[in-house]
């Protein structure tokens, strides 16, 4: 899409190997990602709304690399399908005993991200199917979805599929795509919303080392 930061079909064109630091798995393969998506595509009738939202949340993570709290904080007003821009300006997170909308973790977290053609189509269909919700990803009450709910569903699905996954891995997949495209570290830092240049640079260094080994 615009500026060619991300492959048009990253799940088809890119081959991603696991990135490991201190023996901890940091990403999943695109085959595993698609297995997870396919599992949510055939829900029970009473789980269709929830499954549709899990799918949208996963694709948003894949194509934008945003944090789970940022994804769940997205409202329709933050998504401009005419200009193909998503504005990241708030998040849903637990504060003490409450789960609520809050400001972002740092100034660098406030950013605007391009929407790929694939994500555009996914969001457009989602909005047409569920026109009544204020939030992009929502629960059965049309309110924001809690991160615990999404995490628990992903954990159950992954256990049944025999794969290890958490939502944060999508950030590594996204940054890996930027690396494979030759995107400058400073640009990748801005897109990922990292407050520290070193955070992004360390990931690029890991990918350099992995490339050398392979």
Where are these regions (language model features)?
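DNA/chromatin major-groove-contacting recognition/catalytic segments
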Residues: 12, 36, 97-101, 202, ...
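Short, basic (Lys/Arg/His-rich) helix/loop patches that form interaction surfaces
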Residues: 40-51, 64, 113, 129-136, ...
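Helix-turn-helix-type domain boundary/helix-start signal
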Residues: 4, 26-27, 113, 168
């Amino acid at each position: 899409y615009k500026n060619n930061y991300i492959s048009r079909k990253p799940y088809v064109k890119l081959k991603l190997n696991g990135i490991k630091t201190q023996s901890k798995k940091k990403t999943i393969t695109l085959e595993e990602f698609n297995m997870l998506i396919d599992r949510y595509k055939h829900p029970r009738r009473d789980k269709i709304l929830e499954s549709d939202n899990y799918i949208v949340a996963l694709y948003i993570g894949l194509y934008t690399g945003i944090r789970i709290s940022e994804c769940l904080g997205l409202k329709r007003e933050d998504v401009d399908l005419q200009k193909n821009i998503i504005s990241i300006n708030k998040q849903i997170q637990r504060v003490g005993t409450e789960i609520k909308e809050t400001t972002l973790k740092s100034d660098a977290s406030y950013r605007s991200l391009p929407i790929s053609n694939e994500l555009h189509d996914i969001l457009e269909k989602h909005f047409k199917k569920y026109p009544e919700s204020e939030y992009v990803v929502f629960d059965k009450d049309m309110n924001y979805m809690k991160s615990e709910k999404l995490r628990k569903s992903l954990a159950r699905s992954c256990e049944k599929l025999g794969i290890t996954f958490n939502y944060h891995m999508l950030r590594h997949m996204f940054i890996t795509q930027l690396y494979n495209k030759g995107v400058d570290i400073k640009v990748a830092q801005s897109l990922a919303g990292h407050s520290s240049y070193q955070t992004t640079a360390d990931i690029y260094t890991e990918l350099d080392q992995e490339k050398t080994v392979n």
